[in-house]
């Protein structure tokens, strides 16, 4: 793949969406609201634990993982939500993984994909997602707002992902309640945890904020803990010798 990761991925998503049909709505899976949970549990840094077999930057990470066992370990050790990669081409995920995991855990599940169309949102909801991801860099603001409103009208929560100040301002403008700061540049796929620290100076009171990517150790987590409600962690958990211990290590006590 070229260095321009995001445009390449979005081109592929356009092809995939053209082949999707709009599914009939199935009942929304019942669990707690992530926003409410993060607002009311601020004594520690909450973990969004990810099931991810591969990525464009890392290549194969853990192809042989038992996805349900991994998800259950996350849940048993206090994860606030499980993020499930559903992108097939670039992350070796699958919508079926979301279906499997969602039937086996009680906590919220995030459909982690590059969503550009309502059909993807309905498919994710029907597969058991209670939260979807919308990436500011992937969509014009008006379209982002349309998809955000569509998702919330279906009872879903939305993690709105940003990477820089203009994108954070967009997330604030559309009224996002759950905002992610991705420490990974989606054009180059390079990471810098300082992205989270720099943007945290522009946070508002109402939303909750999640730091994403480039968090591997308790020391990394401690850097962002004073400013964020939670962190999204994939690679560090998928490669850990002791997954339970790694989840606990990242749950920084905020007092």
Swiss-Prot record:
Tree of life domain: Bacteria
GO molecular function, a single term: indole-3-glycerol-phosphate synthase activity
Positions of transmembrane segments: none
Enzyme Commission identifier(s): 4.1.1.48
The entry's keywords: Amino-acid biosynthesis, Aromatic amino acid biosynthesis, Decarboxylase, Lyase, Tryptophan biosynthesis
SUPFAM superfamilies, alphabetized: Ribulose-phoshate binding barrel
GO annotation, biological process: L-tryptophan biosynthetic process
Pathway(s) served: Amino-acid biosynthesis; L-tryptophan biosynthesis; L-tryptophan from chorismate: step 4/5
Pfam families: IGPS
Catalytic reaction annotation: 1-(2-carboxyphenylamino)-1-deoxy-D-ribulose 5-phosphate + H(+) = (1S,2R)-1-C-(indol-3-yl)glycerol 3-phosphate + CO2 + H2O
Top-level EC class as recorded in UniProt: lyase
Family according to the record: Belongs to the TrpC family.
NCBIfam families assigned to the protein according to its UniProt record, in alphabetical order: PRK00278.1-3 (NF001371), PRK00278.2-4 (NF001377)
HAMAP family assigned: IGPS_B
Protein name stated in the entry: Indole-3-glycerol phosphate synthase
Originating species: Streptococcus thermophilus (strain ATCC BAA-250 / LMG 18311)
Gene name in the database record: trpC
